[in-house]
């Protein structure tokens, strides 16, 4: 079948040269597109690919840097937590030590106050015993003078009698106390 003999209607060339010129023009246009347009498109595609690839690489680098920074901050945070725990433990131990020292000081002060109070009580007791002995001695001498009917003016003899009387009184209550304790 011959192309020229086909019924192409309005598309049918009037002269066979038109087909040759058409084919040459199509080949020329194809060559022109291949030499001028395609390299530009390829260049644009390559630039676009490089831009995208560079963006991806930059994003990956940024992500890696962010991950490294996150790990660094997490390590610093863990270190800070450990340090805070250490400081808290030190503060607790120092607080316990301070409390122990304050208790010891308070106990020493309480012991000193108790000792001072006991000494003062003992001094007051001794003073009261001396005063009571002197008064009892005077009363005993007066009573003895009335009973005997004579004046007991010899101080040494009076003092010896009073001391003997008081020591017998001192022995009696402790003996009666021991009897009371044994009964209980």
From Swiss-Prot:
It comes from the Bacteria. GO terms for molecular function: proton-transporting ATP synthase activity, rotational mechanism; proton-transporting ATPase activity, rotational mechanism. It is found in: Cell membrane. Keywords: ATP synthesis, Cell membrane, CF(0), Hydrogen ion transport, Ion transport, Membrane, Transmembrane, Transmembrane helix, Transport. It is a single-pass membrane protein. Coiled coil: none annotated. It holds the Pfam family ATP-synt_B. The chain crosses the membrane at residues 19-39. InterPro entries: ATP_synth_B-like_membr_sf, ATP_synth_b/b'su_bac/chlpt, ATP_synth_F0_bsu_bac, ATP_synthase_B_chain. Gene3D superfamilies: F1F0 ATP synthase subunit B, membrane domain. The keyword Ion transport applies. Its main location: membrane. One of its GO terms (cellular component) is proton-transporting ATP synthase complex. F(1)F(0) ATP synthase produces ATP from ADP in the presence of a proton or sodium gradient. F-type ATPases consist of two structural domains, F(1) containing the extramembraneous catalytic core and F(0) containing the membrane proton channel, linked together by a central stalk and a peripheral stalk. During catalysis, ATP synthesis in the catalytic domain of F(1) is coupled via a rotary mechanism of the central stalk subunits to proton translocation. HAMAP family: ATP_synth_b_bprime (MF_01398). F-type ATPases have 2 components, F(1) - the catalytic core - and F(0) - the membrane proton channel. F(1) has five subunits: alpha(3), beta(3), gamma(1), delta(1), epsilon(1). F(0) has three main subunits: a(1), b(2) and c(10-14). The alpha and beta chains form an alternating ring which encloses part of the gamma chain. F(1) is attached to F(0) by a central stalk formed by the gamma and epsilon chains, while a peripheral stalk is formed by the delta and b chains. Belongs to the ATPase B chain family. This is ATP synthase subunit b. The lineage of its organism: Bacteria, Bacillati, Actinomycetota, Actinomycetes, Propionibacteriales.
């Amino acid at each position: 079948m011959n192309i020229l003999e086909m019924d192409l209607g309005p598309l049918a060339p009037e002269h066979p040269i038109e087909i040759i010129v058409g084919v040459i023009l199509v080949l020329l246009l194809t060559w022109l597109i291949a030499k001028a347009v395609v390299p530009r498109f390829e260049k644009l595609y390559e630039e676009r690919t490089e831009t995208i690839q560079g963006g991806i690489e930059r994003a990956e680098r940024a992500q890696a840097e962010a991950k490294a920074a996150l790990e660094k901050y997490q390590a610093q945070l863990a270190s800070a937590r450990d340090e805070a725990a250490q400081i808290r433990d030190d503060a607790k131990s120092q607080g316990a030590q301070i409390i122990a020292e304050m208790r010891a000081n308070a106990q020493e002060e309480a012991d000193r106050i108790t000792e001072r109070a006991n000494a003062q009580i003992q001094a007051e007791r001794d003073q009261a015993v001396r005063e009571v002995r002197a008064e009892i001695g005077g009363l005993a001498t007066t009573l003895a003078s009335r009973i005997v009917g004579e004046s007991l003016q010899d101080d040494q003899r009076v003092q010896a009698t009073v001391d003997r009387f008081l020591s017998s009184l001192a022995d009696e209550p402790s003996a009666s106390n021991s009897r009371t304790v044994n009964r209980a």
